[in-house]
From Swiss-Prot:
Swiss-Prot/TrEMBL keywords: Endoplasmic reticulum, ER-Golgi transport, Membrane, Protein transport, Transport
Organism classification: Eukaryota, Fungi, Dikarya, Ascomycota, Saccharomycotina
PROSITE patterns to which the protein is assigned, alphabetical: RINT1_TIP20
GO BP term (any one): autophagy
Originating organism: Saccharomyces cerevisiae (strain ATCC 204508 / S288c)
Protein name in the entry: Protein transport protein TIP20
Functional description taken from the UniProt entry: Required for protein transport between the Golgi and the endoplasmic reticulum. May contribute to tethering of coatomer-coated retrograde transport vesicles to the ER membrane through interaction with and stabilization of the SNARE complex.
Gene designation per UniProt: TIP20
Length: 701
């Protein structure tokens, strides 16, 4: 007790303690009940587990437990496992029985079997497989079943399929050779013979479809294939097509086996082409059997596929040779043959190009790059060949592209890398090298003239433009559009073309470097011819009336005639060149600016003029500038400003507007009214002010 208040509240405190004691007692009671319940559940679980051990191994025992304990989840799971084990054991028993049957059948001669017998065996075996469930957790029982399944399947394929296929196909091979079905001697009108051959083909085809793939074959991809599997893909051997291709195989071996060392590679592929051209559609017509799956498209594809086999073998053996020349010829023939198979025979199966390894592709690419560079050097090494360099270069590009086109036409994902390599190492590299060559080549001798140097620059521009158009055409070919899309997709780029950077370099060379060089060279030549014209000092004393416009009544100053002739010759040469119109117009526009500058700075500002002098000045300017033949609708700011400047200077001779010559008016610098009166649009106010001062200071007489 701490005080009187605690003493007064003693009853409340006693009640609180009693409540806490009751609550604690309740919790203790609940805990005792929970522990007792847990003990009961544990005891029950132990009882159930013991019952499962004793009777839960069978479906019947599990049903008894379900009746006793209810629908427990563990019982459902155990029942599922029991059912699977029962089915699996039944499958094992059936496979054991089937294996014994196969052992018995192995003793029977092949001629005692019919196709229906094989179909029945196939159906029986596949039905056994279907009754055994697929499970994720592989236990020892399932592993044993799978082992037995593979053993029985392999024995079925060997004892039944392989043995019968070999026997029946040997017989069919002989019939086909005797019938000479792939020669002109074949009597296609013999209905009985055609029917017999077709039935034999169909029987072998149906037998091929009864082959059962082993589990590891479907999982391991390119692992070792059994004899009854095709050696060029993962499909089972179609024995009828192997027989149909046997005649070609015999002929091919006869012609090329003994003389393989002396036969040109090209003859192998020509022999193939001739054989298919003669016999493909004959084979389709004779052996198609739509009712049994041998449709015309199937025969079309598979006949070519099997006829290709000896060619594949020949290609493989040749690819192992170390002779680079032979290798290059072989690849060229492979590319051409695959393209021909696609375009001429509409074959979409696995072509010969699939036989070429990465190592061989690398050798081929390196060789083609080396040859392309060597040919490029040949057409650019002699400066005297400069005049025809662009034509020779484009011929080289066309030749290389035509050679590579069969390679580009092959739709084979693994070839994308090599297609990109040819684009980069050959086409992009060569076009860049040609631009470097053009920018540095000098075909002139030491006694050159400035005009010859100008013409060489014009010729360079023409060559670059010619090749530039070829690059644009090349980049629009489907293969390069396709490769651009691939690069953009894989590298997250937005190239318009793989040649984009090369095109930009060509455009810069033309529109900046060469264009400016041409303007500069013409400017220097023109300035040289204008020396005497700049010395004229009689502009203020001319007495003969002159029409400022070009016409028969007026002639340019004698000192300007040579400049006119030279500029005309240079512009005619420029117009004769095959260069972009935009660049030609820019060159002429820049030359017009040069002419305006010469006439303004070297003549108009440095001399006094009378009215005839101004007219002669303007006539001379028009005579020289008109040679440029710029479009009439084209507006040149400097040219228009010069015309307006002369118009202002002629105000001296306009008695109706002398108020514009008032010094106070001129001093204001505000010439709005004057501009309206004389339709001045381009000349700046400062230039107008200078012109008006020239008038009142006596420079215009």
């Amino acid at each position: 007790m701490n005080g009187i208040d605690d003493l007064l509240n003693i009853n409340d405190r006693i009640k609180q303690v009693q409540n806490e004691r009751n609550e604690l007692a309740s919790k203790l009671q609940n805990l005792k009940q929970s522990l007792a319940s847990n003990d009961t559940e544990v005891a029950l679980s132990e009882v159930i587990a013991q019952d499962i051990i004793e009777v839960g191994a069978s479906v019947e025992g599990l049903e008894q437990l379900r009746a006793k304990y209810g629908d427990l989840q563990i019982l459902n799971k155990l029942e599922k496992v029991a059912v699977q084990q029962t089915q699996m054991q039944a499958g094992v028993d059936k496979l054991d029985s089937f294996e014994r049957q196969l052992d018995e059948l192995a003793e029977q001669p092949p001629d005692q079997f019919t196709l229906d017998d094989v179909k029945a065996l196939h159906s029986k075996l596949t039905s056994v497989f279907a009754t055994v469930p697929q499970i994720n957790n592989i236990d020892s029982q399932y592993a044993a079943y799978n082992k037995l399944k593979s053993k029985v399947t392999g024995k079925y394929n060997d004892v039944i399929i392989q043995r019968l296929a070999t026997n029946w196909s040997n017989t069919f091979d002989q019939k086909l050779l005797e019938a000479q079905w792939d020669t002109q001697k074949f009597a296609s009108t013999s209905v009985g013979l055609v029917k017999c051959l077709r039935e034999n083909s169909t029987k072998l085809y149906q037998l091929s479809l009864l082959y059962l793939p082993l589990e590891e074959e479907t999982q391991n991809g390119d692992s070792e294939r059994p004899l009854s599997r095709s050696n060029n893909n993962q499909e089972p051997v179609l024995w009828n097509f192997k027989s149909l291709a046997n005649n070609f195989n015999v002929r091919f071996t006869y012609h090329f086996h003994a003389t393989s060392s002396s036969s040109k590679i090209e003859t192998y592929f020509q022999f193939l082409n001739d054989y298919l051209a003669e016999n493909l559609y004959k084979c389709i017509n004779i052996f198609h059997d739509d009712c049994n799956g041998l449709t015309k498209p199937v025969i079309h594809e598979q006949f070519i596929n099997y006829v290709l086999q000896p060619i594949r073998d020949k290609v493989r053996s040749t690819l192992f040779q170390n002779d680079l020349k032979t290798l290059i010829v072989l690849i060229s023939q492979i590319l051409a043959t695959d393209k021909n198979l696609l375009n001429s025979f509409h074959y979409h199966g696995l072509g010969l190009v699939s036989l070429i390894s990465d190592e061989v592709w690398e050798k081929w690419i390196n060789y083609e790059v080396e040859m392309a560079n060597r040919q490029f050097i040949n057409i650019t090494k002699n400066p005297e060949d400069f005049p025809k360099s662009s034509q020779n270069f484009v011929k080289l590009i066309n030749k290389i592209y035509d050679y590579l086109e069969p390679f580009y036409d092959l739709d084979f994902d693994l070839l994308v890398r090599y297609k990109l390599m040819t684009c980069s190492l050959i086409f992009m590299n060569l076009t860049s090298s040609y631009l470097d060559y053009i920018l540095t080549v000098d075909s002139l001798n030491e006694t050159r003239t400035k005009e010859q140097e100008l013409y060489q620059t014009m010729a360079k521009l023409q060559h670059v433009n010619f090749v530039y158009r070829k690059i644009k055409s090349l980049s629009s070919n489907f293969i390069f559009i396709q490769l651009t899309d691939i690069v953009n997709s894989t590298e997250s780029k937005k190239y318009n073309s793989l040649f984009q950077n090369v095109e930009n370099d060509y455009e810069k060379a033309m529109s900046t470097d060469m264009q400016n060089s041409i303007v500069h060279r013409i400017q220097k030549l023109l300035k040289e011819t204008l020396r005497n014209y700049f010395k004229i000092s009689t502009w203020s004393t001319l007495e003969m009336s002159v029409d400022e416009n070009i016409g028969p009544s007026s002639v340019p100053s004698a000192e300007l005639v040579n400049s006119i002739n030279v500029l005309r010759r240079l512009i005619n040469k420029l117009d004769s060149m095959d260069i972009p119109l935009a660049i030609s117009l820019k060159v002429k526009n820049e030359l017009l600016n040069v002419i305006v500058n010469y006439f303004t700075e070297s003549i108009l500002k440095l001399n006094k003029f009378n009215q005839n002098g101004l007219n002669q000045f303007l006539h001379d300017f028009k005579s020289l500038s008109s040679i440029l033949s710029l479009p009439s609708h084209a507006t040149n700011y400097k040219c228009m400003s010069l015309h307006e400047l002369v118009k202002i200077l002629k105000l001296k001779y306009d008695p109706n507007n002398q108020q514009f010559l008032n010094p106070e008016y001129i001093k204001t610098g505000n010439f709005t009214s004057l501009k309206e009166a004389y339709s001045i649009k381009y000349l700046k106010d400062t230039k107008i002010q200078d012109a008006l001062y020239r008038i009142i200071y006596g420079n215009i007489l």
